[in-house]
Amino acid sequence: MRHNQMYCETPPTVTIHVKSGSNRSHQTRKPISLKRPILKDSWEASENNAQNNKSKRPRGPCLIIQRQEMTAFFKLFDDDLIQDFLWMDCCCKIADKYLLAMTFVYFKRAKFTINEHTRINFFIALYLANTVEEDEEEAKYEIFPWALGKNWRKLFPNFLKLRDQLWDRIDYRAIVSRRCCEEVMAIAPTHYIWQRERSVHHSGAVRNYNRDEVHLPRGPSATPVDCSLCGKKGRYVRLGLSSSSSSSSDTGELMEKDSQELHSAFSVDTAGDPPHTYSQVANDHQSNKENETNFVKKNKSVEWFAESEE
């Protein structure tokens, strides 16, 4: 059985410790010795000092990933709306495996509780990841109608404020290394969200300005755009699709309720800076399905998260 805690190293930061002047004044100076040690002894001493310094050297900041946190993150993808959003992104330009791993890292850096693993927080973190990593600005705008519903044009300025609040909550540490993403994915490597590979021809900052204009965002009511590079029908495999279509009335009602909650969260006048407003936008309308998708049932790597604590 695997350990309950997994470690994922993040880019190290530099900490400078400065002693106060009062402490320096009371320090006794050691006499300077000019004796030259024997060469062999000095070589062994230098090796021992190097090993001691290496062992005493503080390690960089790390993420301690709890089992229940990863489980709560995976449960987000049981939501029909999020599944349909992934189905729409058939070329993995908005939510490939690295952007999804960054989303989880943001949840950790923000110290989200289990109750804060909500749909709206997922879209906010994913939008921030796209802002940091992607050079093509237009693609990420597709997140607006999925997260905010039909009134997204009125609500997206507030959505951007929530993104900035999340950025502040993670202490503006929005850069996530490739190694950190891969270590997060290595916890459950066969989960279907880590199979979302982006094709090479969709990588980089090279743009084709002669392409047919596609007005973005298109929203949940539209079908994925045919991609001549990925194939006319797009890549719909291994995305964890839901049985409901993206144009279902239930999905539309859920999005409308979420947009109303987001609007009401900003309509309240508060004195001072409200702590973590975006965490107050509760997602009470996620899917009521208790059964996981067939793919997750066959995914044995997730059993580690489903097992009870011994």
Swiss-Prot record:
One short Pfam name that applies is Spy1
Per the record, residues carrying Phosphoserine are S221
Print the keywords alphabetically. Cell cycle, Developmental protein, DNA damage, Nucleus, Phosphoprotein
This protein is called: Speedy protein A
Subunit-structure text: Interacts with CDK1, CDK2 and CDKN1B/KIP1. Identified in a complex with CDK2 and CDKN1B/KIP1, where it interacts primarily with CDK2.
Question: Could you tell me which residues carry Phosphothreonine?
Answer: T223
Q: State the family named in the UniProt similarity comment for this chain.
A: Belongs to the Speedy/Ringo family.
Q: Name one GO molecular function term.
A: protein kinase activator activity
Which InterPro entries is this protein grouped with?
A: Speedy, Speedy-Ringo_regulator
Location in or out of the cell: Nucleus
Write out the function statement from the record.
Regulates the G1/S phase transition of the cell cycle by binding and activating CDK1 and CDK2. Contributes to CDK2 activation without promoting CDK2 phosphorylation, by inducing a conformation change of the CDK2 T-loop that obstructs the substrate-binding cleft prior to kinase activation. Interferes with CDKN1B-mediated inhibition of CDK2. Mediates cell survival during the DNA damage process through activation of CDK2.
Q: Which residue ranges are recorded for the region named Disordered?
A: 241-310
Q: What is the effect of changing F107A?
A: Abolishes interaction with CDK2
The entry's note on the tissues where this protein occurs is: Expressed at a high level in testis. Also expressed in the adult ovary and in immature oocytes.
- Superkingdom of this protein's organism: Eukaryota
Which cystines does this chain contain? none
Free-text note on domains in this protein's UniProt record:
The C-terminus is required for CDK2-activation, but not CDK2-binding.
Gene from which this protein is expressed: Spdya
Residue ranges, annotated region (Speedy/Ringo box): 67-199
What does the entry give for GO biological process? DNA damage response; establishment of protein localization to telomere; G1/S transition of mitotic cell cycle; male meiotic nuclear division; meiotic attachment of telomere to nuclear envelope; oogenesis; positive regulation of cell population proliferation; positive regulation of cyclin-dependent protein serine/threonine kinase activity
- Origin species: Mus musculus
**GO terms for CC?**
chromosome, telomeric region; nuclear envelope; nucleoplasm; nucleus; XY body
